[in-house]
């Protein structure tokens, strides 16, 4: 077949017109060094702080140090096969995690990937792990309670929805037990829970998950795990990932509770990363921004106004406030609350529950020290009945501690002092509570009423715990309607007072403890 020049030129024009080229521009760099999970990259001129960098093998690193001629990034996951000369690319994205109701009942890692063997996670989208906390105008004052189920906490150190309450104490003083019981107590409250395990043994986390499942609380809980075997980067980011999952509920007019267990290990992981990135060390070798590490996390726990929720949901949710309540845990060394990280977190939070090893070893559990434990905003959130009945408890314990120390030196004590010491011992005994046995508002109110109105005076100290158990069993059997009314309303008036008095009078008459 012979083509003339005109046909050839027409064919070339046609092909040129149909030619389509798609070009993709990537900001590409080269790894110049790899050590201890930190990579140095040359050539990423347009990288953002905190941006995800795509590595070979479908992995990512996060850019943390932006220097004049190189970028310091921390690898998310294994790094043994990374080598000098490998090419990496910018993604233009900040780290995001999946959020939504589909995560409830699941155990996930820092990146939101399932690690419980139950298949893929259903989610409603992705949310950046780093979010700016709601502003002052978007917030609302704390005035609704979060019941932990512990008498000593709900009576003396009440927690409100949207509050940040620190749980602080030495190792093996019951910090995790208190937090896990608080989650178990939310089964029927409608509060969604997030438990973030940072730097813990896998066996410990497995036990927590099993206990939550046994008590029917796992279906209402998201467990985020960055265990001790995970990289420092994942341990550092885990609290922010958990917080993003909690904010999903807060911003849609619901209530959520998040436990950070514990932030001491997160600070250690961040210190490790900072030192490997050659940032200048400060006090206790922590970097200069370790306060900001925790403040930007804990400020995201808040109670937001109905207007904020309405604007966020584009009018889908109206007239509802949302809240995210945080219970960060800090581990102290030999009770030293004046160390760097504990003082930082104490100053950020709205109060602290201080657990003492001396009390724990003496069998007083939860080992709460009421003298230095405080809730700065929770008092406004207490139910009326708890506020009315708990007033004398803290005073009685404070006087008891003072007199107990004094009585060791005094040989003969007057009757009034003996009476106060006796009452203090019985209140201390009454506030003891076993793990995984949270109490309802009505049950707590009944116990506190017995202590307040002198019903324990003729009960031997060794019989206080059996007395309380028998009283609660009697009340739930004979006066279930009264307990239900108190749980639903939380009010306290002369009628309720008379009914409580009647319950205790009738019970004391049975002598059945």
Swiss-Prot record:
It is found in: Cell inner membrane. Gene3D superfamilies: 2.40.30.20, ATP synthase alpha/beta chain, C-terminal domain (1.20.150.20), P-loop containing nucleotide triphosphate hydrolases (3.40.50.300). The record marks 373 as: Required for activity. GO terms for cellular component: plasma membrane; proton-transporting ATP synthase complex. Disulfide bonds: none annotated. ATP binds at residues 169-176. Its EC number is 7.1.2.2. One of its GO terms (molecular function) is proton-transporting ATP synthase activity, rotational mechanism. It catalyses: ATP + H2O + 4 H(+)(in) = ADP + phosphate + 5 H(+)(out). SUPFAM superfamilies: C-terminal domain of alpha and beta subunits of F1 ATP synthase, N-terminal domain of alpha and beta subunits of F1 ATP synthase, P-loop containing nucleoside triphosphate hydrolases. Belongs to the ATPase alpha/beta chains family. Produces ATP from ADP in the presence of a proton gradient across the membrane. The alpha chain is a regulatory subunit. This is ATP synthase subunit alpha. It comes from Proteus mirabilis (strain HI4320). The gene is atpA.
